A protein has these predicted regions:
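Small-residue hotspots
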Residues: 74, 92-94, 100, 150, ...
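Acidic/histidine-rich alpha-helical segments that form the ligand environment
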Residues: 90-109, 113-117
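Core segments of transmembrane alpha-helices
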Residues: 63-74, 143-151
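Membrane-helix exit/interface motif
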Residues: 31, 47-51, 68-80, 103, ...
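Interfacial segments of alpha-helical transmembrane regions
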Residues: 3-17, 79-99
Length: 159
């Protein structure tokens, strides 16, 4: 049975991965749809503003802090090698670290950086905007599913 500080660590992992999944789900289900409905110049400007304002201590604490929690869960699981839940705990950590945090670094952030380099009212921005929305949203769907799946398998480890 998982108990004590290890239990608390895993519950924190469930909460963190679940909160991140919720934020990503909001972007996938309505924020990006709303932005896509705007004229390209407005959509580009709005998304660039969102990307700048998203880098706050609160968001970074939740997002990067959850990645640290998931890494800690993986390390502690390897050290303790519990009789029950080890597969779920390692899978949950991998899902979040690679499917959410890692994917953010290799898929979403580079697209955000590319969007930041275009001037909102230009033909270049108008041409890039539909591609950005499609690709960014697709990768965000993957991050959403990976984060939610991490929360679920962490919960399964506790059951």
């Amino acid at each position: 049975m998982i108990d004590g500080p290890y239990f608390v660590l895993i519950v924190a992992g469930v909460l963190g991965t679940g909160v991140v999944a919720g934020v990503f789900c909001g972007f996938s289900t309505f924020v990006m749809r709303g932005l896509a409905a705007l004229p390209p110049a407005q959509g580009v400007a709005a998304m660039n503003a969102i990307n700048v304002s998203a880098v706050t201590p609160a968001f970074m604490l939740v997002f990067a802090g959850t990645a640290v929690l998931c890494a800690m869960i993986a390390v502690v699981t390897f050290v303790l090698w519990p009789d029950e839940g080890k597969v779920e705990l390692l899978l949950g950590s991998a899902l979040f670290l690679f499917g959410s945090f890692g994917l953010t670094l290799v898929a979403n952030v580079p697209r955000n950086d590319a969007l930041a380099r275009v001037e909102p009212g230009t033909p270049e921005a108008a041409a890039y905007w539909p591609t950005y929305v499609r690709e960014w949203t697709m990768w965000n769907h993957v991050r959403t599913v990976a984060s939610a799946a991490a929360a679920v398998v962490y919960l399964l480890a506790l059951s």
